[in-house]
Amino acid sequence: MRFDLERPSQNASSHRVAVLLINLGTPDAPTPRAVRRYLAQFLSDPRVVEIPALLWQIILRLLILPFRGVASAKKYAAVWMPEGSPLRVNTEKQVEGLRHLLQLNDYTVLVDYAMRYGTPGIPAMLNQLKLAGAERVLLMPMYPQYSSSTTATAFDDAFSALKRMRNQPEIRTVRQYADHPAYIAALAAQVHNYWHQHGRPDFAAGDKLVLSFHGVPKRTLDLGDPYHEQCQQTGALLMQALELTQVECRITFQSRFGKAEWLQPYTAPTLKELGAAGVRRADVFCPGFTADCLETIEEIGMEVRDEFLHAGGKDFHRIPCLNASQAWIAALGEIVAQNLQGWPVQALPVPHTTGA
């Protein structure tokens, strides 16, 4: 194996500790070509699709990418913002918020972000942080619940990059924070703030709150992945914080891909059933997504909304994700600070000298 050439740090004396927020990724543009490139990288990850690689690549290249690239590009175009992809825009705002919060608390740390798929990639950002003087890096996945297909593959990518480095930085990882009190409090604050602005559902009249988490194949649960358990844990704690019962609040799973069985109940059929059963208002919140993206804005806010209304529902509300809300930035800062303990994150005072 050939190791990377080590270049001198550009700022070795200023910042020795870095925090790297990691999210899933996004295409660079809402075009079929860009989306196909992104999906090819995403769906080629063996932690995402666990079937024999050769067989899967034939299916992916011949049957999925040519058609799904066009269809997905249309969906991305429907949610694309003037500044770019919603996930990228929201993640950049989270970086800015966390950086500002840590600076207010006298932390002299670098804060940036990387995407597991697409740009900026994890290896490139690790190298960039090293050039900026980082000798210690905290990897902070923006996935509150651990899963092999999200958290683990992000760490895989980071560790693969380390294997090529001659001079490796010290690494810490945040595995999960599904039950962290600050995270749960931020979720509850987000829901309460939305209800304060748009009105609270009439739960006594049968209105519902649905907590929709990203789905994964059920097979991963059977193989020992803790994701389902942690989603249930987050949901239960959030219900408790909101003082809701399991009759008033449901936990579901969205974004099913392919024909295999995924974690259930599925979000879209659940909303369709609620509408058909006479539920007037349904609010949907996605606690596992820390930033709004295609799956929350388009899938929930458009597709699932239409399913509910066409089935007979009257009032649909998509509660925005945590994004860069004040409560979430404060919670993120608390989680990060706890995981930075023992590292030199604050500037040392310059000793005063006196003349003889």
Curated annotation (Swiss-Prot):
Enzyme class, broadest EC rank: lyase
Superkingdom, natural source: Bacteria
A GO cellular component entry from the record: cytoplasm
Keywords carried by this UniProt record: Cytoplasm, Heme biosynthesis, Iron, Lyase, Metal-binding, Porphyrin biosynthesis
CDD domains in the record: Ferrochelatase_C, Ferrochelatase_N
PROSITE patterns, sorted: FERROCHELATASE (PS00534)
Catalytic reactions on record: heme b + 2 H(+) = protoporphyrin IX + Fe(2+)
Signal peptide segment: none
Location in or out of the cell: Cytoplasm
A matching Pfam family: Ferrochelatase
InterPro entries documented for this protein: Ferrochelatase, Ferrochelatase_AS, Ferrochelatase_C, Ferrochelatase_N
Molecular function GO terms recorded: ferrochelatase activity; metal ion binding
UniProt-listed Enzyme Commission number(s): 4.98.1.1
UniProt binding sites for Fe cation: H214, E295
Family according to the record: Belongs to the ferrochelatase family.
Function in brief: Catalyzes the ferrous insertion into protoporphyrin IX.
Protein name, UniProt field: Ferrochelatase
Organism of provenance: Paraburkholderia phytofirmans (strain DSM 17436 / LMG 22146 / PsJN) (Burkholderia phytofirmans)
